[in-house]
Amino acid sequence: MGYGEGDISLISFHSVSNGYYGECGRRGGYMEVTGFNSEVRKQVYKVASLSACSNISGQILMSLVMNPPKVGDESYTSYREERDDIILSLSQCAEAMVQTFNSLEGVTCSKAEGAMFVFPSVRLPKKAIGAAEAMNTKPDVFYALRLLESTGIAVLPGSVFGQVPGTWHFRCTILQSEEKVQLIVYRFKSFHEAFMEEFRD
């Protein structure tokens, strides 16, 4: 893939808070635009220019992301080991969460591929949907609030992202430590089983 107008049109994003670095709360990122004509690129740059630039720490972080230690640098070995450990840990956390979600009644979850989140789909019982509607609440919000109240686990209801009507999802981060993930999946499993039993049709 090249950068000419005849190439595939693609806009790619990366940020330090949502990359494998996991620097949550830090603000810094980039956008790469390829395969668009000059007029489209000009408009994209115009819109991007309306935003304030990252603060100094965000700019420093992006500089480090774009220019990490290289073979031969004094810090390369420790950088590579830490990076590899982070990637392995994230992979194991994601796998544990996906396996747990897929083992639960009415829940399906695709494998996480390069994201810091998983998006399980939940088939909620009609009684749960009715209880949510009685509270003038979306069913996935109802589920997420019950989860938070029961376990302290916070997830983001899928309805904030838009979803096919009549389907329910939530977003769950995989950035916790491996030790915490084991506790989270245990609590989540216990909550979900009790929730499904309480609202069984």
Regions found by a protein language model. Give the residues of each.
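PLP-dependent class I/II
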Residues: 1-201
